[in-house]
Every structure is written in C-alpha cells, then in structure tokens.
Design a protein with these regions (language model features):
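N-terminal helix-forming leader/targeting segments
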Residues: 1-9
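Short, 15-30-residue, compositionally biased linear elements
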Residues: 9, 16, 195-196
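Residue-level detector of structural "landmarks"
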Residues: 16-22
Length: 279
C-alpha cells in the first residue's frame, strides 16, 4: 500500500495518510518553470506557479507541462473521458484533442484496467494529456501510475476530502476534483490549488449518467470564481455543446457518453463535431 485510507466516522468521506516517502523526483522550481515554458502568471486558480515534480531531462514531461497550461487556460478545450482502447487514444491524439480520461473505478462501465491503461498511456505520452480518474480507495493506484509517468493529471471523482487533494498538491501533481452540481460550495473557497469539474448529480454512481443538469448553477459558480479552472461534464454532446459553452464558459468540456457509440468505444464523427464546436 502506498497510502492508507481511513473513513471519517459517519461521513462516508475518506482521507489519505501518507505511508511512505514521496517519490524522489527532481522538481523544477517555480522560477525555472516560468522561464522554461513562458508560463502565464495565472495558473490553476490564479496563484504563483507551484513546483512540479518533473525531471528536466524528461522530454515527455516538459511537453506535458506546456499542454497542462493550455488545458487549464481561459480558452475552452476538450477532454474525452472513458477511453478504453489504444486505437481510440491514438485517434484522439491525432485530432489534437487536449486530454483523454482513463477511468480506474472498477464499477464504471468504462473501466480501464491498469494493465490496459499502461499500454494506452505509454503509446500516447506527450501527444495528449492523460487524466487518471479515481474514486475513493483508488488513491494508492493513482500514486503508482504517477510514479510510472503514465498519467499527467489526477481526477478525484468520489467522496475524497481536502486532505486527499492536498496530498497531490503537496507533490506538485495537477488535480481535478469532481463535484456534484447540487453540492457546489456557495462560499469563497479557501484553497486555490486545484481545478473543479462540475457534474450531474449521480449519487454513488459517481458520474457517467449521460444526463445534463441546470447549467445556470455552473455558470453562476464560474462567474463568482473566475480564476478557478472549471470543467463541465454531464450529458454534453455535439447537439448541446455550444449551448453549454455559452451558459457556463468552462475551461474545458469533459465528455464520455456524448462522444461514443457504446460505453468505452468512441464515435469519431461525434468527436470531430465537438472539436468543430470548440474551434
């Protein structure tokens, strides 16, 4: 076990307690980071750029940093989630889709085993951002995949707490925290170190419903927190993507069922239509 998960009494929430030292990876300092890729002053939630645990000799990592900056910028981009085949991943990269999502929650109908993900992720490294989607007790796996340079961004899509998020922030790992639209905070957020993904309420299904929600809720949140990179998910498809962009003005659209022919198999006519909407 890389980290131990303990359940908070009666809350159904989890926190991560580190059970080993962090990976010994040479970090780039904040000043080196800016100079290296001419990073914008505003990154993630408007803070100074953190030190990312990236080996300066690793070309793939350097490319990923630049791609991460673009992904969380004010120009909307596209993340296609629920990728399960190398063929689809390679086609998404060729189309210049910003990011793909690999879902490591075993109960998901778009589940991608670590073995399959290793093949997919290693073949498209540096060509497309690889987002690992984790639910609750998958956190040790997230650390393992980061150590192996198989994912670029961690997406926490369960009942994780700020302690879980902070663990990855402390390692300089970009984090997206998924939040149900009916549980958005209505107050100023005290920590501005991670991005948010607003999704349709799904209970213990943790997303993947293919259903939309009242986008004015997400739009109001973005208006109140303009420096927070906010991704929008939930029932988005080529027919309503333009409306979603107008209503919310997200940093990115996160789409699974709206870009596939069956769970985990992507429909590239839909993908190309979505890309056209974003162009």
């Amino acid at each position: 076990m890389f980290c131990q998960l303990a359940q908070l009494s009666g809350t159904g929430e989890f926190f991560c307690a580190l059970a080993r030292e962090a990976p010994q990876i040479n970090p780039i300092s904040s000043s080196q980071f800016k100079h290296r890729i001419n990073f914008p002053e505003i990154f993630f939630l408007g803070r100074d750029i953190p030190s990312f645990p990236v080996d300066p000799e690793n070309v793939t990592s350097a490319l990923s940093i630049d791609m991460i900056a673009e992904f969380f910028s004010s120009i909307p981009s596209l993340k296609i989630c629920g990728v399960t085949t190398l063929r689809d991943a390679e086609r998404l990269a060729k189309l210049k889709v910003a990011a793909l999502g690999l879902n490591f929650w075993p109960s998901s109908k778009r589940y991608c085993s670590p073995e399959n993900a290793s093949t997919i992720a290693s073949h498209v490294a540096g060509d497309i951002l690889r987002v690992g989607v984790f639910v609750n007790n998958s956190l040790p796996l997230a650390i393992e995949l980061i150590d192996e340079c198989l994912i670029d961004i961690v997406q926490l899509h369960g009942d994780e707490t700020i302690e879980d998020i902070q663990f990855f922030i402390d390692q300089g790992i970009p984090v997206i925290k998924a939040v149900s639209a009916d549980k958005l905070p209505n107050h100023e957020l005290p920590s501005h170190d991670f991005a948010l993904l607003i999704d349709t309420p799904a209970g213990k299904d943790y997303g993947g419903t293919g259903k939309t929600f009242d986008w004015s809720i997400a739009g109001d949140f973005v208006n109140k927190h303009p420096k927070i990179p906010t991704l929008l998910a939930g029932g988005i498809n080529p027919a309503n993507a333009a409306e979603a962009l107008t209503a919310v003005k997200p940093a990115a659209l996160d789409i699974a069922s709206g870009a596939e022919s069956s769970p985990g198999i992507k429909d590239f006519e839909k993908v190309q239509a979505l890309m056209q909407t974003l162009s």
